[in-house]
Amino acid sequence: MSEENYMRIIDLRGKKLTRAEMLEAMPRAEMGTNEATELVQPILDDVKARGAAALRDFAEKFDHIRPENLRVPAEAMKAALDELDPEVRAAIEESVRRCRAVSASQVPAPFHTDLAEGARVAERWIPVQRVGLYVPGGKAVYPSSVIMNVVPAQAAGVESLAIATPPSRNNSDGLPDKTILATCAILGVDEVYAVGGAQAIAMFAYGAKGSEPQDGEILCDPVDKITGPGNIFVATAKRMVSGIVGIDAVAGPTEIAIIADKGANPSWLAADLIGQAEHDELAGSVLITDSEDIADKVQESLKYRVPRTEHAERVNTSLRGRQSGIILTDGIEQSIDAANAYAAEHLEVQTADPDAVIAKIRNAGAIFRGPYSPVPLGDYMSGSNHVLPTSGTARFAAGLGVHTFMKPVEVIEYDEQGLKTLAARVNAFAVSEDLPAHGECVLSRFIDDPYNKATIKEQEEQAGLR
């Protein structure tokens, strides 16, 4: 390997690592959550106490603009749609169409299980009633995140949807980016707020009273669940209000891992790593390969490509950061082990037998099979969802989908005979846990005196419970 490597090397060859050692070897970004918590708590408290007045103050402080309208007027959304570039509109509408098709297939069906005559347990899937969807701003504009949040929520049957997204510094009126507003209009979402950051999360969690006539008495009602990605402050705010409302996940910086063997195209690998690094200086780009030759060629391709991409400075910082690297392995099995330990948000598999590799992948937010399924396809147009678990949480968490916006609720339906068959056993169980009233409430339906423990078995026999 050259001493002038673009990305650092993590060499696992010849090493037999324990599970803990493998997890420790994976490249990760420093999150700084303690510092973020100290900054976010006062924001949450202020929005809870002062509502829209606090939201305007924070917009002025962080976004350098004081919006007249925190809730985007309907005419502004219509104007944004009318002004939208036809080619961009066509792309957005195609993305929506594909995402709707996939989301429709995800809607779970109710089912029931008959355990005996008169003994049924059913399961219903009920939509969350009101959801707050956060769409980030910052270094880029993300109309795609509008689609990825709204479409599965609509497919789930969510009754009330609200979107919060930061005001655009390009708009003197303090409204969000026009492409985001146009996307909301295409999707039929009319409750949109020009509010970003931790203060948007506070608004969703606690609601916000109005402070100016155009706000009304109540600017925003509280929601039941908050979804959508954001920066460290948004993620921290979501974590801090979790329990007051539901959240989808606490997202960290975006990331990609690529499992590649000697047959992969190094130029494409380099382009894919750069594509993810473009998001943020803390974005993670990781190549996992058993081919030192591929690793060398990717390093050389990066040296050629990075200076030529528009956001070269950001990409350079990301690729050279501690959260990125090239992991060298002894073979495909160790590459798979490393990928499962890293648990990437996006995992590309560019190997001779991708299906054999994918069959052994346990941990990934989404898997992109083969060289013609790059991550940006999933970001925009594949029909899959791009709101995915990050920072290793794909070991236990899943990406956004219809299920995110629904709750399974069991319905227990026993008739008299169904309960009678189990009454004595329920009572025995309850007594073993020293919760006799549990058993007594069941026995009360069949015997006269469930509190007379001296005659309980006799009463059960007379009632046909034994």
Predicted regions and their residues:
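C-terminal core of ALDH-fold dehydrogenases
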Residues: A341-L465
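Short acidic-hydrophobic, aromatic-tinged amphipathic segments that line or gate anion-handling sites
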Residues: Y6-K15, E191-G196, I326-G331
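General beta-strand structural signal in soluble alpha/beta enzymes
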Residues: F111-L115, L133, I163-T165, E191-G197, ...
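N-terminal Rossmann-like NAD(P)+-binding subdomain of aldehyde/semialdehyde dehydrogenases
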Residues: S2-Q129
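Conserved small-residue-rich beta-alpha loop and adjacent elements
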Residues: T113-A182
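A conserved active-site cap/scaffold subdomain adjacent to cofactor or substrate pockets
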Residues: A249-R322, I326
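Conserved NAD(P)+-binding/catalytic subdomain of aldehyde/semialdehyde dehydrogenases
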Residues: V189-G284
